[in-house]
């Protein structure tokens, strides 16, 4: 959230953040963080309050939940605002497995949210876990098409899948739109900064809200994230400190 909010603000998007879990740090590189859990009742209460006050949303972005018990309350929240576009990043794993604090039951809980997603934003690992497809570091176009079609059948209207090896560059970004796959070839940098996905998502959804196509939006998101990674490496920033976005926010104005 700390990477997304500045991005949205700079791009002229007013955000209304609703926390699902509060952590003293992210879950990688700082040991066990202090955690404050948000109750399902709070999420539902927010929805009821906004409805009472006639608050409207152009888009609802669903990101890190951290607790499978929140899935039903998130569905309730979405149902209260049927005119909003729903974008869902099912944050739960990478490198072929669940993050250490999640398991298959968490994945099943997140599956319940797929039907409400106008746009689903998993990485390759998350797309395999949700589709029930064996993960591999190299997947053919046929494999990727099957994964996309499975997620589409589960209810996702459109997909953008990140961290996809395609045999020509180390990681690409896949767009699945109207039954067609488009690959954006990217160059991989030798670092994995925390918060990269949040920055990518922020630029992506802001670009969509400003009227850009999905392809244009993901190109702009990648351009910004790549520049931030270059700056972070240049400054010899620790990966656990997260992606350094501040010096590149001007790119989004």
Predicted region positions:
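Charged C-terminal helix
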Residues: 215-253
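Conserved phosphate/ATP/ADP-binding segment of small-molecule kinases
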Residues: 101-181, 191
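Glycine-rich beta-alpha junction loops
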Residues: 21-23, 66, 92-94, 126, ...
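Conserved N-terminal subdomain of the carbohydrate kinase-like
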Residues: 1-100, 246-252
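Short beta-strands and strand-loop turn motifs
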Residues: 59-62, 87-95, 121-130, 161, ...
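Short, small-residue alpha-helix embedded
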Residues: 129, 191-214, 218
């Amino acid at each position: 959230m700390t990477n997304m909010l500045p991005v949205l603000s700079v791009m002229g998007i007013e955000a209304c953040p609703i926390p699902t879990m509060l952590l003293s740090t992210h879950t990688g590189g700082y040991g066990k963080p202090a955690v404050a859990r948000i109750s399902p009742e709070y999420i539902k209460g927010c929805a009821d309050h906004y409805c009472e006050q006639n608050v409207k949303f152009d888009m609802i972005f669903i990101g890190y939940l951290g607790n499978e018990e929140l899935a039903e309350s998130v569905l309730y929240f979405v149902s209260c605002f049927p005119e909003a576009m729903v974008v869902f990043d099912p944050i739960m794993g990478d490198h072929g497995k669940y993050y250490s604090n999640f398991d298959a039951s968490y994945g099943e809980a997140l599956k319940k949210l797929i039907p409400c997603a106008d746009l689903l934003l998993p990485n390759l690992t998350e797309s395999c876990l949700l589709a029930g497809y064996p993960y591999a570091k190299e997947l053919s176009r046929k494999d990727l098409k099957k994964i996309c079609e499975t997620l589409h059948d589960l209810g996702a209207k459109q997909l953008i899948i990140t961290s996809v090896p395609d045999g020509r560059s180390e990681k690409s970004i896949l767009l699945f739109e109207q039954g067609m796959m488009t690959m954006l070839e990217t160059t991989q940098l030798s670092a994995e900064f925390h918060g990269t996905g949040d920055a990518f998502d922020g630029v992506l959804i802001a670009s969509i809200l400003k009227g850009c196509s999905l392809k244009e939006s993901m190109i702009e998101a990648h351009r910004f994230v790549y520049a931030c990674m270059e700056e972070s490496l240049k400054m010899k920033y620790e990966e656990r400190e997260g992606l350094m976005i501040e010096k590149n926010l001007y790119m989004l104005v």
